[in-house]
C-alpha cells in the first residue's frame, strides 16, 4: 500500500500510532510530504526514523527549509528569527543540545537533499506530491497554500499537498 502524510510537526507518538493503525510494513511505502519537524519536541527523531527506513520518502516542507536557511551553509539573514517564530526552537535545541555534531551534519545533509515535489504513478494513476502548492517555482512548492477552488494544473494527475490545514479548505473546524 502507498501512503502519504504531512505536517507531523514533531508529534512522534501520533506518527507511531499512525504507523501502527495502518499496519505499516516492508511491503508499504510512506511519503512524508514535508514538515516533520518543529512545534513539538520529537521532530529530529521523526527525521531519523525516515532516514533509517528504506520504504519512507520525504519531501521538503517550509519548516525543513527554515531549518536549512538557519543552520545550512548559507545561514540566511533573518532566517533564525523566522524559524523561531514558526516553532523551530524545539528542533534547534534538539539538534544542538541532544545530537552530536556528526549526527547534526548528517541530518542537515539529508534535509538539503530532499526534493520539493515528486511525481509518482500508482496503479496507472499519476500523482504529484508537493508540500505547499503545485507550481513552477520552488517557493510556491514549499510555501504556497491551495484554495478550495484550486484544481490540479497537470492533466490526468491528482495533486496531493500538505501545508494547508484541511479546515481552511472545508470551512469545518
Model regions and ranges:
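Hydrophobic positions in the central parallel beta-sheet of the AAA+
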Residues: 3, 30-32, 128, 159-160
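Core catalytic region of metal-dependent phosphoesterases/phosphodiesterases
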Residues: 5, 10-83
